């Protein structure tokens, strides 16, 4: 049987714990105002369901489908020397450092203090008298302190997880910016290719119109034509010259744009040759939509990591309502008499050890306000959809719209170019060049030029739409097997994320392995597995 003293001690301990817990500040009615929606619960829509499902996910170097080595070179240059690339890598390193700072709070802390002071001791009623009254001595102390915070409520652990989630979100944001840079380079390069094609048509049209003007002048010299015919034939030449100048200016502007995206001067773009783009890849969608897309779109991954970090912030805010218990220990030496090293003698040593407890009782509503802010910060989407995201979301519709245009332009080219253009010389040989026939010839030439002029924009639109589709599918980002929300310790906020993680085949990994993986991710500028 327990002695009465032991029973009394246990009763006092239970009473003390009860009073401590009751004395803590109240959380009030603070709870998250939103819940996460499962990806598989969303309707993908008839367009996605009817799309080709054999295309597969894009590769990390998806732009190589254009089969242009010069494009590959400039994308690599943009990735290495973009002006904001260093800033993105710096933000990733900063987030990694903050994660290490949060991690250090979970470990024991050892601090040393050394004080070497020459002191004059007073001689009065309050501070003296005594053996040291009105004397000058050394007051030297040296201590070594150990402190360890007992994380009974998971505050330090959740703070570390929040910092790691923030680091993952920063790395995913950096990868999203890198993908956007790749798309911008491809878009500028495709625009240059289109302007080169339009420039060829403008030169061809100008030469054709100049030959018609020469023919009109010869007719005038032979007495078969009029000055009006010459003026009509020459009136469009300045317009064609201005078109040539505008296309050449657009090409030069694209060169400067590519040089700027690569972080180089305008002169670097002068070495860019004419693009040789060729795209045979079909426009289709992967077989697992939309659940797998959550783990492949870097902007979506960043938003999910952000929501995950906000959920950890709720746990940190809740833990602030409970008592803090620290284990403290100090050992040191103290000396106030001669010699100078008197404090190092064993007889002058001392130590302290024991727990230290602090608890919030009245804090003016500060903790409840912090918890309310943490709950309000958790939003289903994590952040608003940006204009770039809307463009990517609309990009998958463009290939289907560009293909008919390209097909119609190709049919028009074969019809007008294959049938009418060979007949023009025969018509010119059989019929005398009368004014009405000159006008008919000019009309046929204009129809041919119009059909050809529509083809480059349609082809360019298809090439750009392919880049937008690759970006909308994530650009070949590999985020690893661990995804946001795969840790069950999130409680209510993680329950809704478990289904998307399971749908994409995600498996949680040990938290101890995360810092090294985050560091590797930051070095590469891409989100890594947690």
Swiss-Prot record:
Keyword Endoplasmic reticulum among record annotations: no
Residues linked to a lipid group, N-palmitoyl cysteine type: 24
Membrane protein topology class: Lipid-anchor
Signal peptide: 1-23
Alphabetical list of PROSITE patterns matching this protein: PROKAR_LIPOPROTEIN (PS51257)
Subcellular location(s) per record: Cell membrane
Chain residues carrying a lipid of type S-diacylglycerol cysteine: 24
Biased composition (Low complexity): 421-430, 494-530
Region (Disordered): 375-442, 476-530
Any one GO molecular-function label of the UniProt entry: efflux transmembrane transporter activity
The entry's keywords: Cell membrane, Lipoprotein, Membrane, Palmitate, Signal, Transmembrane, Transmembrane beta strand
Keyword Transport: no
Entry-linked Pfam families: OEP (PF02321)
GO CC entries: plasma membrane
Protein family membership: Belongs to the outer membrane factor (OMF) (TC 1.B.17) family.
Functional summary from the UniProt entry: Involved in the resistance (detoxification) of the fungal toxin fusaric acid.
Name of the molecule in the record: Fusaric acid resistance protein FusA
UniProt organism field: Burkholderia cepacia
């Amino acid at each position: 049987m327990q002695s009465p003293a032991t029973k009394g001690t246990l009763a006092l301990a239970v009473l003390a714990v009860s009073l401590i817990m009751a004395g803590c500040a109240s959380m009030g009615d603070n709870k998250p105002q939103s819940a996460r929606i499962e990806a598989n619960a969303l309707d993908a829509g008839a367009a996605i369901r009817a799309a080709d499902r054999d295309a597969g996910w894009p590769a990390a170097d998806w732009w190589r489908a254009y089969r242009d080595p010069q494009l590959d070179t400039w994308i690599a240059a943009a990735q290495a020397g973009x002006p904001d690339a260093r800033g993105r890598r710096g933000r990733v390193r900063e987030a990694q450092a903050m994660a290490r700072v949060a991690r250090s709070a979970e470990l024991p802390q050892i601090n040393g203090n050394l004080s070497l002071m020459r002191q004059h001791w007073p001689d009065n009623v309050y501070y003296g008298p005594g053996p040291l009254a009105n004397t000058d001595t050394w007051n030297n102390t040296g201590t070594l302190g150990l402190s360890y915070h007992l994380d009974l409520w998971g505050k330090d652990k959740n703070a570390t997880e929040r910092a790691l989630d923030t680091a993952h979100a920063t790395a995913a944001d950096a990868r999203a910016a890198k993908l956007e840079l790749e798309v911008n380079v491809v878009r500028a390069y495709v625009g240059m290719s289109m302007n080169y094609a339009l420039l060829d048509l403008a030169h061809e049209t100008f030469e054709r119109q100049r030959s018609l003007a020469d023919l009109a002048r010869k007719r005038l010299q032979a007495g078969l034509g009029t000055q009006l015919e010459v003026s009509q034939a020459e009136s469009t030449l300045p317009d064609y010259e201005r078109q040539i100048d505008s296309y050449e200016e657009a090409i030069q502007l694209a060169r400067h744009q590519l040089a700027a995206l690569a972080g180089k001067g305008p002169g670097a773009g002068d070495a860019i040759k004419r693009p040789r783009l060729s795209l045979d890849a079909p426009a289709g969608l992967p077989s697992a939509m939309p659940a797998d897309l959550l783990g492949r779109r870097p902007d979506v991954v960043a938003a999910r990591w952000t929501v995950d970090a906000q959920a950890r912030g709720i746990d940190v805010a809740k833990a602030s309502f409970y008592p803090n218990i620290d284990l403290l220990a100090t050992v040191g030496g103290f000396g106030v008499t001669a010699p100078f090293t008197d404090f190092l003698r064993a007889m002058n040593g001392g130590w302290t050890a024991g727990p230290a407890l602090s608890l919030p009782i009245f804090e003016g509503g500060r903790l409840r306000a912090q918890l309310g802010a943490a709950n309000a910060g958790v939003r289903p989407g994590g952040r608003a959809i940006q204009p770039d995201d809307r463009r990517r979301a609309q990009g998958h519709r463009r290939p289907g719209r560009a293909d008919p245009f390209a097909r119609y332009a190709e049919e028009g080219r074969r019809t007008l170019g294959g049938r009418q253009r060979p007949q023009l010389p025969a018509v010119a040989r059989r019929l005398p060049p009368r004014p009405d026939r000159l006008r008919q010839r000019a009309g046929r030439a204009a129809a041919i030029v119009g059909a050809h002029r529509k083809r480059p924009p349609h082809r360019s639109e298809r090439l750009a739409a392919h880049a937008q589709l690759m970006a909308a599918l994530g650009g070949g980002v590999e985020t690893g097997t661990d995804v946001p929300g795969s840790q069950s310790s999130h409680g209510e906020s993680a329950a809704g994320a478990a289904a998307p993680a399971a749908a994409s085949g995600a498996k949680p990994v040990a938290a101890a392995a995360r810092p090294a993986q985050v560091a590797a991710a930051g070095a590469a500028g891409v989100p890594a597995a947690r």
